[in-house]
Amino acid sequence: MLLIDIASTSLNVGGTSSRLAKVERIAELLRAAAPDPELVAIVVAWLSGELRQRQIGVGWAALRSLPAAAGSPALTVTGTDAAFSEIGAVSGKGSAARRRELITRLFAAATETEQAFLVRLLSGELRQGALAGIMVDAVARAAEVPATAVQRAAMLGGDLPTVAAACLAAGSSGAAGALDSFTLRVGRPIGPMLAQSAGSITVALERHGGATIFEAKLDGARVQIHRTGDEVTVYTRSLDDVTARLPEVVQATLALPVSDLVADGEAIALQPDGRPHRFQVTASRFGRSVNVAAAQAKQPLSVFFFDILHRDGRDLLDAPTTDRLAALDAVVPARHRVDRLTTADAAAATDFLRATLAAGHEGVMAKSPTAPYLAGRRGAGWLKVKPVHTLDLVVLAVEWGSGRRRGKLSNIHLGARDAATGEFVMLGKTFKGMTDAMLDWQTARFTELAVGGTDGYVVALRPEQVVEVAFDGVQASSRYPGGLALRFARVVRYRDDKGPADADTIDTVRALY
């Protein structure tokens, strides 16, 4: 298969608003790739906006000056993927020049259509929230299996390209069996369960229809922990392996009386009095260039387990919350568990929320006692209750500031994700809540994300940066395309641990109106 086949499909898919048309066009390409599992995996990864290599050290700056395009298509898909691997493997002295040389060679062999696709793929412009859902549907269509089966296999396998390759290689008669082979496996990360928002304790109790399990919601970093014997691996919310950076989590896990374990938890930096540090202190321990020993000595992390998905040969994904917590409590000491209260009484739950907030945490999680663990899905079984409304939105553009903020990229344009189209719907602007340090940081960050330069008053951005925004409410507005705007929006923090696919949807905003 040639690169032009994928580039043309991407162009075609981007040019139609019909979800069904997008799905069918991608499914058609997948059927053509089906005889070769590796080819299928590449197609799925690229059209989902991802590289199989994850990161290859090529940023927007490296793509600004490109050679003339080739006259006719000759690049193969597998050859291009191999070129990505070669670029990503470059390191050491002279690596920047060598990487530029390889990029130039690749782009010189690409046609204009292929170059445009490669730029979007390498710069992250293909990453949109709806792509994952469209790709799941396309794989299901091509393999003639239910989309729900593909989604579950991908969540348990942790990797849609791998699932798609196995499913399509098995043919229509064996696809269902291939999907069934993807089960929870210790050592292979799965998509984490996500929570919906609830406006109050009362709402959470009503939605769960009675007694609810309330847990302290810590403002740390989500971790998924796997243990097999004496080997422990730790993954982030985005399924990156951070084992080497979190020795405290490894040590705490090895101290548990288990042989095999998959657990969900939170790593957090605490002050001497037990109150949490601001999130950025915790996040600093996750950097790739961190000196782990020095960072651990300066600011150790604590780990708190709040769910268990597998223990010593028993899968617990489909077990109700009460059973999973009983299995957790049997092996995890209280000092490593989040505070918890089970009640149907709103007053008692409100007191628990107040105590949690007084301890410096951000709110509570309300969990249905009967809910299974929905890997990779946002369900009503988990509800987050915070004292103020917050949303995770994407920064679409930014304006140059004036007065104290002159010379800084300041007023940010906020967008919610449209799950149906993968586009973002603007909800307003804000510069409230920004410190001087934040203004300095975002000026540098948004210069990197700028599309078409930074000379204009309004600087358009690639929709990649997620920001947590607090607000007082949602109001009707004819000014914005979604008909809604946020009241008194202010920046809480930038969420580098989340991507645009994790941003809240416009449907979530509508539900708050």
UniProtKB/Swiss-Prot annotation:
GO terms for molecular function: ATP binding; DNA binding; DNA ligase (ATP) activity; metal ion binding. GO terms for biological process: cell division; DNA biosynthetic process; DNA recombination; DNA repair; DNA replication. Keywords: ATP-binding, Cell cycle, Cell division, DNA damage, DNA recombination, DNA repair, DNA replication, Ligase, Magnesium, Metal-binding, Nucleotide-binding. InterPro entries: ATP-dep_DNA_ligase, DNA_ligae_ATP-dep_bac/arc, DNA_ligase_ATP-dep, DNA_ligase_ATP-dep_C, DNA_ligase_ATP-dep_cent, DNA_ligase_ATP-dep_CS, DNA_ligase_ATP-dep_N, DNA_ligase_N_sf. The active site is at K217 (n6-amp-lysine intermediate). ATP binds at E215, R222, R237, E266, F306, R378, K384. It is an enzyme of class 6 (ligase). It catalyses: ATP + (deoxyribonucleotide)n-3'-hydroxyl + 5'-phospho-(deoxyribonucleotide)m = (deoxyribonucleotide)n+m + AMP + diphosphate. Its EC number is 6.5.1.1. Its cofactor is Mg(2+). CDD domains: Adenylation_DNA_ligase_Arch_LigB, OBF_DNA_ligase_Arch_LigB. Belongs to the ATP-dependent DNA ligase family. DNA ligase that seals nicks in double-stranded DNA during DNA replication, DNA recombination and DNA repair. This is Probable DNA ligase. It comes from Mycobacterium marinum (strain ATCC BAA-535 / M). The gene is lig.
